[in-house]
Amino acid sequence: MDDHKRPLYLPFAGPAILEAPLINKGSAFTDEERVFFNLEGLLPHVIETIEEQASRAYDQYTNFTNDLDKHIYLRNIQDTNETLYYRLVQNHITEMMPIIYTPTVGMACERFSKNYRRNRGLFISYPNKDRIDDLLNNSTRQKVKIIVVTDGERILGLGDQGIGGMGIPIGKLSLYTSCGGISPAYTLPITLDVGTDNPNLLEDPMYMGWRHQRIGGEEYTEFVEAFMQAVHRRWPDALIQFEDFAQKNAMPLLERYKDQYCCFNDDVQGTAAVTVGSLLAACKAAKTKLSEQRVTFLGAGSAGCGIAEAIVAQMIAEGLSEEQARAQVFMVDRWGLLQDNMPTLLPFQQKLAQKCDDIEGWDNFSENISLLDVVNNAKPTVLIGVSGAPGVFSEEIIKAMHSHCPRPIVFPLSNPTSRVEATPKDLLHWTKGQALVATGSPFEPVVVEDETFEIAQCNNSYIFPGIGLGVLAAGAKRVSNEMLMASSRALAECSPLALDGEGPLLPPLEEIHKVSKHIALAVGKVAIEQGHALPCTDELLEQSIEDNFWTAEYRRYKRTSF
């Protein structure tokens, strides 16, 4: 029997049920339930279906004209009736995705303390560093299987938001459920409150976090270590997703823990996986292979380098040597092209720096080679922006790229919309509709010469829900690079443009459940092959995916004796 058909036995009654978001049904409680649980008189007379409730909620939602107000309204529903919240979001996923997550969630993070209404998740503050086990035991969620954790230092393109960064784990886990079918009862957002270096927050009397400069060095490392150990003691099988940590911490934390715990960094690995999946789809549409591309990045931080390493891995999988693959990837930051003689290269940048001997014959060769010079000399076929610098993909740069590449692949991925390197409208007009475009934020379709182009949003929500579902269904103990590569290939297999020669580069969000299940199967298979999960047949894995896929439907309640 499916879980939603099996009755749930509850040991409490009365107003307490209406205050519990995971079990509250509001006006959908039946006559029998209203009698058994002492709810008569606490609710209006009419008994509604969840669709009737969702219709009313959507009508209320459409009365708001401001995106932040819409976000706050949806969060209020989430905090009172989670099943209704997810039914509403799933009914309007394309419309509401930008409201519950990027770009609107950025505004919500900036105003988190001012708009605070009700607790959700855990705030683990540095002054409580010796009591982390106690704090985890205080969680209202007991069967946690997926955790998203941030320290709020690098929230989207907005920088240090302190505990305001909690909006990101809340939003990410909303997508795990609405896109990946993970039961909200299994999810827990966590913020590590280690202070903030944002002077506006420190001086704001409404700021609700620990009013202290950020800790760093050994203090920070020991605090995160204590947190990871405590989580493993409390929920040893939970998947931990690191989210929006600063560059100086993101890669070291990932390297330290990826082989100890079931964890991954979405900014580094999730972004890389969805980008590679989108590139594979674009290459299929252009009837070429990723290993035949020359790829230029603007932005050489942890996210950009994570994507680049994933591209290198895929090129190697397609038959190139590592040296050949790395020679086809060009990383540009604010100082110009990364070169192997630069003394300021970070450890994760070093393998991606171009050899000076290989490029000394370029026109305008110097210590600081600009993006335009890279385009003119390297002649890239792929241009990816993760810089957060708006408008830097200029008409001159794009036309220079198009002059040697009939179908340029251009991915301006920076979030939020105000930080995008170029708009799809400009990119398609400058290339007369020939560019293959995917963006990090949502954009409206573009019309060029009477042809309408749907703009694919290269959003991690295409990837991480499926990864989470696959890990959960297979019982995986680790998230390996091979599992991430499998998720990329599975996403590319769902591309309408690659499959049919028309339509968007990525499937519509209305098909996200199908996509997530397809990715979950691919991820689970690799986990089993690598020994990160117990052996099982493909049929059993598929059944486990279906069994673990939660849907927003009310369950019947029965009262236990008390």
From Swiss-Prot:
It holds the Pfam family malic. Its cofactor is Mg(2+); Mn(2+). The keyword Lyase does not apply. It is an enzyme of class 1 (oxidoreductase). Keywords: Metal-binding, NAD, Oxidoreductase. InterPro entries: Aminoacid_DH-like_N_sf, Malic_enzyme_CS, Malic_N_dom, Malic_N_dom_sf, Malic_NAD-bd, Malic_OxRdtase, NAD(P)-bd_dom_sf, NAD_malic_enz_proteobac. Divalent metal cations. Prefers magnesium or manganese. It catalyses: (S)-malate + NAD(+) = pyruvate + CO2 + NADH; oxaloacetate + H(+) = pyruvate + CO2. GO terms for biological process: malate metabolic process. GO terms for molecular function: malate dehydrogenase (decarboxylating) (NAD+) activity; metal ion binding; NAD binding; oxaloacetate decarboxylase activity. Belongs to the malic enzymes family. Homotetramer. HAMAP family: NAD_malic_enz (MF_01619). This is NAD-dependent malic enzyme. It comes from Shewanella sediminis (strain HAW-EB3). The lineage of its organism: Bacteria, Pseudomonadati, Pseudomonadota, Gammaproteobacteria, Alteromonadales. The gene is maeA.
